Regions:
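Extended terminal and domain-junction accessory segments
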Residues: 18-95, 210, 214-258, 336-558, ...
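Asparagine-centered strand-capping/turn motif at beta-strand->loop junctions
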Residues: 149-154, 306-311, 549-553
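N-terminal edge beta-strand
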Residues: 115-141, 280-295, 510-544
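Surface-exposed loops/turns
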Residues: 139-141, 186, 198-199, 298, ...
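A cross-kingdom feature marking solvent-exposed beta-strand/loop segments within repeated
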Residues: 170-189, 288-290, 326-355, 528-533, ...
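Cleavable N-terminal signal peptides of Sec/SRP-targeted secreted and luminal proteins
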Residues: 2-19
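Acidic-aromatic/histidine active-site loop/patch
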Residues: 101, 126-128, 236-312, 415, ...
C-alpha cells in the first residue's frame, strides 16, 4: 500500500505538490468550445472536447450535458445526438516545446495543453490533436459518430479502424486501407460517419502500417441506459475517466525497427509501457514526468474498462494492489461475473472489471508489466478520496512485487486450458446470455468448416537477396532469422484497390487460387518458395462456420487473432499434443467436434463472445462465427509485425448484390499503368532540337 503519498518523492525526495492537486475535478459548469478553427463550421454545434477522459465531466447530468451538446452523458433518458470529432493527425514529439520546464520538475508545465510526456524520453511520435492516447469517444447507443480525420503527417497516408464495432450499416467505414477504403493521403480529410452500436468497450487506432504503435490510438466507449445494462447491478459508478489503455512503447519510431536490424538495437521489444499515455521510469536519473491517477471513494464499486492497446508480442499483466478484479465483460459483451487477481492482456483485448474500493482510504498501485524475459513495468495510482493530507510516497513496487495469482487469459501458463489452474481461459467462461439465435449459431452441423493455420516462412539469404528473379518480397528480421508470416501457407498481399467499394476484379495473378495445392499442402514452404497473394475466403451471407485457429509454426509467439465485422463464439481452446502430425490432429479434432455437435446448444449454451482470440504456440481455438454482415472483413494477428508481414486474410461475406453501397463521392484508387506506345512522342518538337 502507498502511505503518506506525494508523487515526486517517489524518485527525488524533494517537497512536491500533493497528489490531490494533480487530479482533475469533475466540473458540471463546463462549456464546450464551439467554433473551433479545426472544425467544420456546419457541424461546430456538435463538436466534442478532446479531454472527455480527464475527469472533468464525470459528474455531469444528462440534462446538463445535452444542454451544452456533450455526448458523454448518462444514457438513461438520453436523446440521440450527433457527436462530432475533429482530429488532426500530425508528426509530433514527446516532451516538446509545449512542455516547457516539465523535465526540470515543473509539474504545471507537464500538464499544459499540447504537452505529451509519455515516459519522459524525447522522441518523435504521431499524434491525434497532440495527445497520446488520442481523444476518447464516449457516447450513448443510438448516437451518430462523426469523425473528420485530417492527415497533416508529412510522409504518411493513414486510416482509422474502429476496433470491435461491427459497422453493419456502414462497412466502408471499417478503416482498413485497400480493403474497405483508400488510404487518406497527406493534406486531405476523410469523414468517418457511423451509428453508435453495439454498446461496449472498443477503441480506435490507425490500421495503416506501424502507426498505431507511434501514438495513433484512443478509447471508444458506447454505453446503453443503465436500466438496460444487465451487469449494472455489479457497480455503483461507470466514469468517463475510468478507461485505461495499456500500450507498449519504443524510444524510436517503430518503422525504424522494420524490417529489422542486424548490428545494433536488434530487438523488437518495448523500451517502456504506458498507462493512458503516461509512466514514470523508476530511476534516479529519470525525468520528472507525472503518472496517471484514478480517483475513487471508499465503499463504492467502480467499473473500469481496460483496453489492450499494445502492439508487440509480449503480453501484459494488469493488477491493482490489494484489489481483486471482478470481470463483467469482454470485447464489449457481458460475461457471468467472476473474480481474478490479474488480467493477461494481449493486443486488441478489452476487459471490463469492477473494483470494490473497500480498503481504508489511501493510495494503491496500479501496475502493468510484461511477461517476457525482460520485465518492463508501468505504474499508475488508485487514489481514495480522503480528508487526510497526503505527504510522501512509499517504495515503488518492482516487477515481482505483485503476484500473478489467478489470471484471466493466461495462455502462457495454461495453454491446455485445464480446469483448476490459475490461468483461466476464455473457453472456460460463460457469456451472460445465450446467443440471440442459439439454434443458428450453435446448430449441430455448421454450414462451413475452416482451418486457419498460422505459421512463419523462413527465408534463405539466397532466395531473398541473391537468386536472380528480381522479386522484392516483404520480410522481417527477427534476428538471426529472416521471416514472413502466413495463414494457410499464404502470406497476405494487399489488393491494388479496396474490393469492398470498387467492383473491378482483382488481377487473377494476385489472388490466392483456392485449388493451388502448392500453397495448401505446405510443399511451398519445404521447397523454399513463398505463396504471396490476396487471400480471400468467400462465405455465404448468413452462414455459420466452425473455424479452427491453430498454430503450425515453430516459434514461441502467441497470436492474438482479430476478426473484423462480427464476433466469434469460443467453443474450445487447447494445445496440440506433442509428436502428433498437424493434419492428423485437425482430423481428430473435427471428428470430436462433429460427434459433440448434436449437443452443442446444451453443453455450451452460453459461449464467451470475443473478436480477439489468442492462440498459444502449438495451440488452437475452436470458434463459431455467424457471418451475418455482408462485406469484406479482415482477419489478422494483432501483433503488428506479424499482420504487416502477411499473417492476415479476408472473409468475403455475401455477394456484391448483397453489399451496402458506399455514399456518393466515396474516394477511389488503383494502380496507374497506361499503355506504352513507342511512337507516342515522336511528333513532339522539343525546344532543344535543331530546326
Amino acid at each position: 500500500m502507498l502511505r503518506n503519498f506525494c508523487l515526486l518523492i517517489l524518485i527525488y525526495s524533494k517537497p512536491c505538490l500533493s497528489a490531490i492537486d494533480i487530479l482533475p475535478v469533475a466540473d458540471t459548469s463546463v462549456q464546450l468550445q464551439v467554433g473551433r478553427e479545426d472544425a467544420d463550421p456546419q457541424l461546430s454545434k456538435y463538436i466534442q472536447p478532446n479531454d472527455i477522459a480527464s475527469g472533468r465531466y464525470d459528474n455531469i447530468s444528462t440534462a446538463d450535458a445535452e444542454k451544452i451538446g456533450l455526448c458523454a452523458r448518462p444514457c438513461d433518458g438520453a436523446k440521440p445526438m450527433v457527436c462530432y470529432y475533429s482530429w488532426t493527425l500530425e508528426n509530433y514529439a514527446t516532451v516538446g516545446p509545449a512542455c516547457g520546464d516539465c523535465l526540470k520538475g515543473n509539474q504545471s508545465h507537464c500538464r499544459r495543453k499540447g504537452c505529451v510526456t509519455a515516459d519522459g524520453f524525447e522522441r518523435p511520435i504521431l499524434s491525434i490533436n497532440r495527445q497520446i492516447p488520442g481523444p476518447s469517444i464516449q457516447v450513448c447507443k443510438g448516437d451518430t459518430i462523426v469523425v473528420d480525420v485530417k492527415n497533416h503527417m508529412l510522409d504518411r497516408a493513414t486510416t482509422i479502424h474502429w476496433h470491435g464495432v461491427y459497422m453493419k450499416a456502414t462497412p466502408y467505414m471499417d478503416g482498413v486501407p485497400m480493403v474497405t477504403q483508400c488510404p487518406i493521403p497527406t493534406g486531405t480529410t476523410f469523414r468517418y460517419k457511423f451509428p453508435a452500436t453495439p454498446e461496449g468497450t472498443f477503441f480506435h487506432h490507425s490500421h495503416h502500417g506501424l502507426q498505431k504503435m507511434d501514438g495513433l490510438e484512443g478509447s471508444l466507449v458506447i454505453r446503453s441506459p443503465r436500466a438496460k445494462d444487465p451487469i449494472s447491478s455489479n457497480y455503483d459508478y461507470d466514469l468517463y475517466s475510468h478507461v485505461i489503455i495499456l500500450t507498449d512503447w519504443m524510444h524510436s519510431m517503430t518503422d525504424s525497427k522494420f524490417p529489422g536490424r542486424s548490428h545494433n538495437d536488434t530487438r523488437a521489444k518495448p523500451d517502456a509501457l504506458l498507462i493512458n499515455g503516461q509512466n514514470q521510469v523508476p530511476s534516479d536519473n529519470s525525468p520528472r514526468v507525472p503518472m496517471h491517477f484514478f480517483k475513487v471513494q471508499k465503499d463504492k464499486k467502480y467499473r473500469f474498462r481496460i483496453i489492450g492497446g499494445s502492439c508487440l508480442a509480449c503480453p501484459l499483466i494488469f493488477t491493482v494492489e490489494n484489489h481483486p478484479l471482478l470481470v463483467i465483460a469482454s470485447d464489449g459483451t457481458p460475461v457471468e461475473p467472476f473474480t481474478v487477481d490479474t488480467l493477461t492482456m494481449f493486443p486488441g483485448d478489452r476487459v471490463d472489471v469492477v473494483i470494490n474500493c473497500n480498503q481504508e482510504p489511501n493510495l494503491f498501485w496500479i501496475q502493468a508489466k510484461t511477461i517476457c524475459d525482460t520485465q518492463i513495468t508501468a505504474e499508475a495510482v488508485l487514489q481514495y478520496s480522503s480528508g487526510q493530507k497526503l505527504k510522501y510516497v512509499s517504495k515503488r513496487p518492482n516487477s515481482s512485487a505483485f503476484k500473478r495469482g489467478k489470471s484471466l487469459n493466461a495462455m502462457d501458463i495454461n495453454p491446455e486450458c485445464k480446469s483448476g489452474v490459475d490461468g483461466v481461459c476464455w473457453s472456460q467462461i460463460n457469456a451472460l446470455k445465450a446467443p440471440l439465435e442459439p439454434n443458428v449459431v450453435l446448430k449441430p452441423v455448421p454450414d462451413k468448416k475452416f482451418v486457419l493455420a498460422v505459421s512463419e516462412f523462413f527465408y534463405t539469404l539466397d532466395a531473398l537477396f541473391w537468386k536472380d528473379n528480381d522479386q522484392y518480397q516483404r520480410f522481417f528480421q527477427a534476428s538471426p532469422a529472416i521471416v514472413t508470416h502466413m495463414i494457410n501457407n499464404r502470406s497476405f498481399m494487399m489488393p491494388p484497390f479496396p474490393p469492398l467499394t470498387q467492383s473491378d476484379p482483382i488481377p487473377p495473378n494476385m489472388v490466392c487460387p483456392t485449388d493451388d495445392s502448392k500453397c495448401t499442402d505446405g510443399s511451398n514452404v519445404k521447397g523454399g518458395k513463398l505463396c504471396e497473394c490476396v487471400n480471400i475466403i468467400q462465405v455465404d451471407l448468413g452462414a455459420v462456420a466452425e473455424v479452427i485457429f491453430i498454430d503450425w509454426g515453430s516459434s514461441s509467439f502467441l497470436h492474438p487473432m482479430h476478426l473484423h465485422g462480427t464476433d466469434t463464439y469460443i467453443i474450445e481452446q487447447g494445445l496440440k499434443p506433442k509428436g502428433v502430425d498437424n493434419k492428423a490432429f485437425i482430423q481428430q479434432l473435427q471428428d470430436k467436434l462433429a460427434k459433440n455437435g448434436a449437443n452443442l446448444a446444451t453443453t455450451k449454451p452460453k459461449p464467451c463472445v470475443k473478436d480477439v482470440v489468442t492462440i498459444p504456440p502449438s495451440g488452437y481455438a475452436v470458434v463459431r462465427i455467424h457471418f451475418n454482415n455482408p462485406g469484406f472483413w479482415m482477419c489478422h494477428c494483432h501483433y503488428i509485425f506479424h499482420s504487416d508481414t502477411g499473417m492476415s486474410m479476408i472473409f468475403q461475406v455475401g455477394t456484391r448484390d448483397q453489399f451496402i453501397k458506399p455514399p456518393p463521392g466515396f474516394p477511389v484508387c488503383n494502380s496507374f499503368m497506361p499503355k506504352v506506345d513507342p511512337d507516342e512522342f515522336k511528333s513532339i518538337k522539343w525546344d532543344d532540337e535543331p530546326t
